[in-house]
């Protein structure tokens, strides 16, 4: 039977249960026990959007509330990307970039996407300093809470140093121009034009990415990662990256993908997107509990015993692009919240 996982994401936070085997012989120790089965079986994960969490939008404003999160039963904090946001090709309204806006004040109101990273080893100055972030992690550990970072491995922003120093780290067209991410099946752009697609056929780029991942575990003592668009990155890379991180300390890995083979060696948990869309369809009257029963039966055959299927009714992406809970499932949100607390996964 799958280990229990529970997720409730409302606005800028997520609750879930998660678990996986703990690697042996961690090479560093912290003020908190290693990530492991005993902890993760009943762990509540809280997704934090630092910019929107408080009026200040800073690490320090969030850190002061960590004792309150402990009182609420939170065991893992998932922090959305903390890196600086690219200014080159920063999106404005519609298809416009901020560079298309003549008025400087008009440009400044567009803050950019967390997922257009300009430097993997730097802190977004809007949030505070590296020391502020390290204090957040240390405070969490003192309160017996783990911290995982949201990471963007598929692409960078257009002013990332690699753009200028290592253009071969990126996917290029026939004219030798770096391109934004595209659908591998159709070749059409995903529309993420504020980002540049990374080239995972380049071994040097893979090594540099793993180095950046190791940096935050070693420097800030974080406890793992949530990997953005994990289905777009080769599984072999994640397997090597996770093995490298486990050499430093036990880590918890979450994949933003619904791809069971990711959990063989690389990840502890993946997204239950099919289940999420099924709940949306049920709330609209397009499907019923018969389809839900069929889905649950299928999961018993698809997932291995130690795989974790992350059930959720919303997250920061869905809230932004598909609609709020009040818009998508106004009459069912409380019922579905209770439902995900009772289902396996």
Where are these regions (language model features)?
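C-terminal motif of bacterial Sec signal peptides marking the signal peptidase cleavage site
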Residues: 16-18
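Sec-dependent N-terminal signal peptides
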Residues: 5-14
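Active-site beta-loop-alpha junctions enriched in small/polar residues
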Residues: 51-53, 82, 152-154, 230-232, ...
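Substrate-binding/active-site clefts of carbohydrate-active enzymes
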Residues: 31-46, 51-75, 81-220, 241-247
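Active-site-proximal helices and loops of the catalytic beta/alpha 8
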Residues: 25-29, 212-214, 218, 223, ...
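Active-site-proximal substrate-binding groove within the catalytic cores of carbohydrate-active enzymes
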Residues: 299-345
């Amino acid at each position: 039977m799958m280990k229990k996982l529970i997720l409730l994401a409302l606005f800028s936070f997520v609750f879930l249960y998660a678990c996986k085997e703990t690697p042996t012989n961690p090479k560093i120790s912290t003020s908190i026990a290693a990530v492991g089965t005993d902890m993760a079986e009943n762990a509540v994960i809280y997704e934090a959007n630092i910019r929107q969490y408080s009026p200040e939008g800073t690490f320090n404003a969030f850190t002061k509330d960590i004792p309150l999160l402990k009182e609420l039963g939170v065991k893992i904090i998932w922090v959305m990307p903390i890196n600086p946001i690219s200014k080159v090709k920063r999106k404005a309204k519609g298809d416009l970039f901020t560079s298309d806006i003549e008025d400087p004040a008009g440009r400044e109101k567009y803050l950019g996407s967390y997922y257009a990273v300009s430097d993997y080893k730097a802190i977004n100055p809007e949030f505070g300093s590296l020391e502020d972030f390290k204090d957040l992690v240390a405070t969490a550990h003192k309160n017996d809470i783990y911290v995982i970072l949201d990471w963007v491995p598929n692409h960078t922003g257009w002013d990332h140093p690699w753009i200028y120093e290592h253009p071969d780290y990126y996917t290029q067209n026939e004219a030798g121009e770096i391109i934004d991410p595209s659908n591998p099946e159709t070749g059409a752009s995903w529309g993420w034009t504020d980002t540049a697609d990374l080239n995972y056929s380049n071994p040097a780029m893979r090594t540099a990415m793993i180095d950046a991942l190791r940096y935050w575990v070693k420097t800030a003592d974080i406890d793992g990662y949530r990997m953005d668009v994990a289905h777009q990155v080769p599984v072999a890379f994640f397997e090597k990256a996770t093995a490298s991180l486990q050499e430093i300390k036990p880590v918890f890995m979450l994949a933003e993908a619904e791809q069971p083979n990711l959990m063989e060696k690389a990840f502890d948990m993946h997204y239950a997107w099919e289940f999420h869309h099924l709940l949306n369809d049920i709330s609209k009257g397009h499907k019923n509990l018969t389809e839900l029963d069929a889905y649950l039966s299928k999961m018993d055959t698809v997932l291995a015993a130690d795989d974790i299927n992350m059930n959720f009714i919303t997250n920061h992406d869905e809230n932004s692009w598909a609609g709020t809970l009040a818009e998508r499932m106004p009459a069912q949100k409380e019922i579905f919240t209770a439902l995900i607390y009772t289902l396996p996964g």
